[in-house]
Swiss-Prot record:
Signal sequence annotation: none
Residue ranges occupied by any NTF2 domain in the UniProt entry: 391-541
Protein's UniProt name: Nuclear RNA export factor 2
An annotated GO BP: mRNA export from nucleus
Repeat (LRR) residue spans along the chain: 271-296, 297-320, 321-348, 349-376
Native species: Homo sapiens
Domain of life: Eukaryota
Length: 626
């Protein structure tokens, strides 16, 4: 055993990884593999390749760096530590990821920072989080930092297979990070384990750009910056004439190059709104993930004509609140069955996206919540605060605006990833009388008439993509917003339950113009982006009564009403009619103008005149002259 120790060194110089699936402990077999055999050679790609395309095998020079460190460390150890007599265990798996530890003994740390190689201190540690790929970088780093007794600066955060990894250069921070293991719980109440191991300096540190190179890169980026538009054009950066003339090779797939670029952006372009990374042969976005801290105000990102193969890469920069994104020319674009699926996948990462590859998208449903306003329990009808009323009514206004637009993909942002939706109708297929409900029959999950247990499960739509796809397949509609009543019947700090009643008409097909009534029950929670997020949606559709049909769409109103909020008074209705006659605007636009000016007729008239002079009132606001 002692000879084995001599050959392999101690725990602190070995690389430890964690198996991502199932692993078992077992004693080290006689003649078992040494540290050389246990080293995961796939890490050569990151450690010494800086995120360039992984070669078919690691080069000999690349693979020898850490081996040289291990043998070099042996010269520092002359004291026969008692650790040599401890029992040695090996945790291995089919995935070739192994961890070698010593039981009942912490690694000696007093000499961790003594050795140097090529001018770089060896006081570096690699932190590995198994299954880390499941977690958002910002959440993971904040969670670890909040539990860690020492402040630390993560370097080169990246994902390898389904693990998250980063580096720290502080022995005390490394020790504190070890203590955090199994102290953090994720959303599924699973403990998060953390492994910390001695490492060589990360790629971006060992290959850091020299001051002269940084200065030249900064000058090049300054030339490419548009001050008026706050836009930085870095397309085809590697072949920039100024950089090539100085023999400076900037490859943005390399971590050191991307890190240098983001550092210059942070220091020189803090108000950056638009970044163009077109045609840089990017096949991964690990290096770009730091942009969420370095340039958080970016609204437009151009990643077209690169080598991105999966939409999953975009999750690494989903912290940006993008409004415009370009991806055309990437292999990932051809992985979707149709445009709708493509838009859905991209909007999963960027819910506020308005334009994709230059095409306008339907406006997403995102309603900001006043975080200082706590929802208090309520048993009565809609008797909550005015803030709560405004929140719900504004949400519904936007929701049905998109629902009736003809493209319902914009509703993705309104639903939780694992939301549920069901539709039911009081429809008997044996009824010979024609009905507008026929189109809803095959999606109906009416438990009174549905007996097949398999269909009961199939007709319950799960996940927001399935829900929006199901809604998109339903007939196109126009809802009468003036008919809608809202009843908030349950409120807590983490949940809001409300029902919506009203009528709508179909706007296409054989049933065009048919009026139907509906009841919709929503259960929602505060979303991750300070938005209202639907977790459960039940829709009940029926034929409208003669009275409902007669009154439907008789008085166009642009805002919703709640069951505790009275409709317009007689005086207000007369003001709307008079304002419409004088301005030539439709009733709903006239009402909005009056409401915006607190029903002050004179002030509303002045506002109308000013906006009309400036050409800011759209043509659809005015009545059509036949």
């Amino acid at each position: 055993m002692c000879s084995t120790l001599k050959k392999c060194g101690t725990y602190r110089t070995e690389v430890a990884e964690c198996h991502d699936h199932g692993s078992t402990f077992q004693g080290r077999k006689k003649g078992g593999s040494s540290f050389r055999d246990n080293f995961d050679k796939r890490s050569c790609h990151y450690e010494h390749g800086g995120y360039e395309r992984p070669p078919s095998h690691c080069q000999e020079n690349d693979g020898s760096v850490e081996m040289r460190d291990v043998h070099k460390d042996q010269q520092l150890r002359h004291t026969p530590y008692s650790i040599r007599c401890e029992r040695r265990m090996k945790w291995h798996s089919e995935d070739e990821i192994r961890i070698t530890t010593w039981r009942n003994r912490k690694p000696p740390e007093r000499k961790m920072s003594q050795n140097t190689q090529d001018g770089y201190t060896r006081n570096w540690f690699k932190v590995t989080i198994p299954y880390g790929i499941k977690y958002d970088k910002a959440w993971l780093m904040n969670s670890i930092q909040s539990h860690c007794s020492d402040r630390f600066t993560p370097v080169d955060f990246h994902y390898v297979r389904n693990r998250a990894c980063f580096f720290v250069q502080d022995a005390s921070a490394a020790s504190a990070l070890k203590d955090v293991s199994y102290k953090i719980y994720d959303d599924e109440n699973q403990k998060i384990c953390i492994f910390v191991n001695h490492s060589t300096a990360p790629y971006s540190v060992k290959n850091k750009l020299k001051p002269g190179q940084m200065e030249m890169l900064k000058l090049t980026m300054n030339k490419r910056y548009n001050v008026s538009q706050q836009a930085l054009d870095l397309q085809n950066l590697r072949f920039d004439p100024d950089l090539m003339g100085r023999d400076i090779d900037i490859i943005l797939n390399r971590r050191n190059c991307m890190a240098a670029t983001l550092k210059i952006i942070e220091r020189n372009f803090p108000e950056l709104l638009s970044l163009n990374l077109c045609n840089n042969k990017l096949y991964q976005l690990d290096g770009l993930s730091d942009i969420t801290e370095k340039a958080p105000k970016v609204k437009t990102l151009n990643l077209s004509k690169n080598k991105l193969e999966s939409a999953w890469e975009l999750g690494k920069v989903k912290g940006l609140k993008l409004e415009e994104l370009w991806l055309e020319g990437n292999p990932l674009c051809s992985t979707f069955s149709d445009q709708s699926a493509y838009v859905s996948a991209i909007r999963d990462c960027f819910p506020k996206l308005l334009r994709l590859d230059g095409r306008e998208l339907s406006a997403p449903v995102i309603v900001d919540i006043d975080s200082s306003e706590t929802m208090k329990p309520c048993k009565e009808n809609f008797t909550g605060s005015e803030t709560l009323k405004h929140l719900v009514l504004q949400f519904l206004q936007q929701y049905y605006s998109i629902y009736d637009s003809g493209d319902r993909q914009g509703l993705l942002g309104a639903y939780h990833d694992e939301a549920c939706f069901s539709l039911a109708i009081p429809f008997d297929p044996k009824d010979s009388a024609p009905s507008s409900l026929c189109k809803y029959f095959e999606d109906s999950r009416n438990m009174k008439t549905l007996k097949d247990p398999y269909l009961k499960g199939e007709l319950l739509r799960r996940t927001k993509r399935d829900i929006v796809d199901s809604l998109s397949a339903l007939p196109k509609t126009q809802h009468d917003l003036s008919s809608i009543l809202v009843d908030v019947w349950c409120q807590t700090e983490r949940m809001l339950c409300f029902s919506v009643n009203g009528v709508f008409k179909e706007v296409e097909g054989q049933s065009q113009g048919s009026v139907l009534a509906f009841t919709r029950t929503f259960i929602a929670t505060p979303g991750s982006s300070s938005s209202l997020c639907i977790v459960n949606d039940e829709l009940f559709v029926r034929d409208a009564s003669p009275q409902e049909t007669q009154s439907a769409f008789s008085i166009p109103v642009s805002t919703l009403s709640s069951s505790s909020e009275p409709s317009l008074s007689q005086e207000q209705q007369e003001m709307v009619q008079a304002f419409s006659a004088q301005s030539g605007m439709k009733l709903e636009w006239s009402q909005k103008c009056l409401q915006d000016n607190e029903w002050n007729y004179t002030r509303a008239g002045q506002a109308f005149t000013m906006l009309q002079t400036e050409g800011k009132i759209p043509a659809e606001a005015f009545k059509q002259i036949s």
